Structure formats: C-alpha cells, structure tokens
Amino acid sequence: MQPSSPSTSHCSQVSIKVQHKIAKKKPIRRKRVDLDCGCSYYLHLNCNNHGFTHRGTHHCSSGREWRFYLGDKQSPLFQDNRTQPEAISNEPRHHFHSDKIQPQHQEGNGDSQMFSRLPNLDDITASDWSFLKSI
C-alpha cells in the first residue's frame, strides 16, 4: 500500500523494544575492584564517594584511585589520576546522631490517639470476642 502523504521523508518513532535492544548493546563503563578478602565488585565509573561494609570492613570508592593494567598476568598498578568533587556534603543531617543508640519515645500511661475510642476490655461482650476471633 502506498503512503497517503506525498513526502518521501517519513519520520516514525523507534519502538521501545528496539530502544531497549540498542541500550543493552552499549558497553557498561565500570571497573572491577578486588578486595583483600578475595571478593570483587564492579564499580560504575561515574559513581564516587559511596561506601559499603563487607565482612566487617568498610570500603569507599573515592574515585581518586583507579587501576591501570599492564598486561594479562601482571599485577595492577594503582595510580592517582585526578580528584573528584565530593558527592556527599559534610553538613549534619536530621538523622545524624553522634552516639550509636537512637533515642526512643517515652511510654505514656494515658490513652493514645489510636485507642482513645476503644471501650474498656471489661465491657466487651461474648459476641464481641467471637467476632474478634473470627477475623
């Protein structure tokens, strides 16, 4: 069937399946980091100043240290090629506590807002109990 438009340059949107296939073919820019315990992880090259704890040791990807491989079987040489801008500010946040234990709310003896309309447990009838058990 011939197109209804006389124009020869028809523009159509690329389907999402084709876009996904193209995106999957793009190489992932990441580096492999080997830990002292023998484990390794892959770090995206645009990711810096994020850390995690593994087997009791804290690891931080500062971005200043990168691996330059000399060959197949040679050890990696660590070099400091640049300084990345700091991604996390040092400002204190609302959840920052210098001590490890977070303060707990005090328990009260009065009615809470949630249970303020409940009747006294002594006033609950047998039919109320059977209804609650059926739930």
Swiss-Prot record:
The zinc finger and the transactivation region are involved in PTGS suppression. Its main location: host cell. This is Transcriptional activator protein. Keywords: Activator, DNA-binding, Host cytoplasm, Host nucleus, Host-virus interaction, Inhibition of host innate immune response by virus, Metal-binding, Phosphoprotein, Suppressor of RNA silencing, Viral immunoevasion, Zinc, Zinc-finger. Residues 120-135 are annotated as: Transactivation. A zinc finger (unnamed) spans 37-54. Monomer. Homodimer. Homooligomer. Self-interaction correlates with nuclear localization and efficient activation of transcription. Monomers suppress local silencing by interacting with and inactivating host adenosine kinase 2 (ADK2) in the cytoplasm. Interacts with and inhibits host SNF1 kinase. Binds to ssDNA. May interact with host RPS27A. GO terms for cellular component: host cell cytoplasm; host cell nucleus; viral capsid. Phosphorylated. It is found in: Host nucleus; Host cytoplasm. Residues 77-117 are annotated as: Disordered.
